[in-house]
Amino acid sequence: MSRLNEIGFDFENDLLVAVGDLVDRGIQNIECVDLLNEDWFTSVRGNHEDLCIQGIDDQAARNCHISNGGEWFYNELSPGDQERMVEQFKELPIALEVNHNGKKYGFVHGHIEQNDWNEFARNEGVSVFRDPAQLAMWGRERLNSDNLQYTHVKGIDAVIMGHTVTEKPFKRDNCYYIDTGAVHWATLTILDLETV
């Protein structure tokens, strides 16, 4: 909250959109999830929220979750609290569109396979070979690849993503990567859409 106060965040009029991974990134897991109850806050679903959802019923997902910071979920929460949190996470969108000052911004946690936002939005969750919803939470290909198949994403002014830690905020085409390692180096990036 101190970072929001530093930048002059207006809790009455501004909206903070998180790019997922509200949990498993430090010791304030519950406090971060509680932000979902605030009118000024929303988030897309990240792979760590997905691990909570999957880990309830799938031992392999649970093991993966535990080895990636999720032990608190199984050790500190009652089964009822786990279920309530999972229900909150199921409500989080895989992708979110925000209109601001005549521009359209897209938010996903990890990756967008398509170079067209509208195609991505229509096909989210339906793919013969690569599930766009899973890629949106787990993928890194657009950032970690010099593959020429990934270009400017049409139909949206900017796509904002997290998931892959970069030393500083990074832009490729109209995609912004803003995970600067808050979990590792306490460097929290807040991107003001006025500057995009």
Question: Where are the predicted features?
Answer:
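N-terminal active-site segment of His-dependent metallophosphoesterases
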Residues: 1-34
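Catalytic phosphate/metal-binding cores of nucleic-acid and nucleotide-processing enzymes, i.e., regions
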Residues: 10, 16, 60-61, 77-80, ...
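Active-site neighborhood of phospho(di)ester-bond hydrolases with catalytic His/Asp-centered motifs
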Residues: 16-20, 43-46, 107-108, 157-164, ...
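Short, solvent-exposed loop/turn segments at secondary-structure junctions
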Residues: 24, 49-50, 111-114, 165-167, ...
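Active-site neighborhood of divalent metal-dependent phosphoester bond hydrolases
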Residues: 29-98, 102-103, 125-139
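Short, well-ordered beta-strand micro-motif
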Residues: 97-99, 107-109, 190-194
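Divalent-metal (often Zn2+) His-rich catalytic cores of metallo-beta-lactamase-fold enzymes
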Residues: 104-127
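Conserved beta-sheet core of the metallophosphoesterase superfamily
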Residues: 139-196
